């Protein structure tokens, strides 16, 4: 499982949705999305949407994944956060870096 954490964290840096990490784990175990969803007691649609990158990892799902894989909920939520940050950087990064910072802020004189 430590290999899962290391490999997943490295891949997260490359704009990979956490569902891809989950898909890889399920493939290695030979487990279908339907069987996995039964194991963690969630609707199959939730798992398939995560696997397709169409649904985010929520707190509830992170707890279930952590329990099943012997990781932490924070691990799964961090993968989701890293993914979302990478997407935001791609979409708005340049505009955000052009904004003032506390060091460059000049109060308006009234």
Protein language model regions, located:
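Short, basic-rich loop-to-helix N-cap that marks the start of a DNA-contacting helix
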Residues: 54-67
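The alpha-helix within a helix-turn-helix
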Residues: 26, 37, 66
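Short alpha-helical DNA-recognition segment
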Residues: 31-49
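The DNA-recognition helices of helix-turn-helix-type DNA-binding domains
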Residues: 43, 54, 69, 80-83
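Intrinsically disordered, low-complexity and often Lys/Arg-enriched segments
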Residues: 1-9, 104-110
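Short, charged recognition helix plus adjacent turn
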Residues: 67, 77-110
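A short, Lys/Arg-rich alpha-helix, primarily the initiator
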Residues: 5-31
């Amino acid at each position: 499982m430590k290999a899962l954490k290391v490999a997943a964290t490295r891949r997260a840096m490359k704009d990979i949705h956490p569902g891809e990490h989950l898909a890889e784990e399920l493939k290695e175990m030979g487990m279908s999305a339907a069987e996995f969803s039964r194991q963690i007691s969630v609707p199959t649609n939730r798992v398939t949407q995560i696997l397709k990158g169409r649904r985010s990892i929520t707190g509830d799902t992170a707890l279930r994944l952590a329990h099943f894989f012997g990781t932490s909920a924070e691990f799964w939520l961090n993968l989701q956060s890293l993914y979302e940050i990478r997407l935001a950087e791609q979409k708005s990064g340049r505009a955000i870096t052009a904004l003032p910072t506390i060091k460059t802020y000049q109060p308006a004189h009234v």
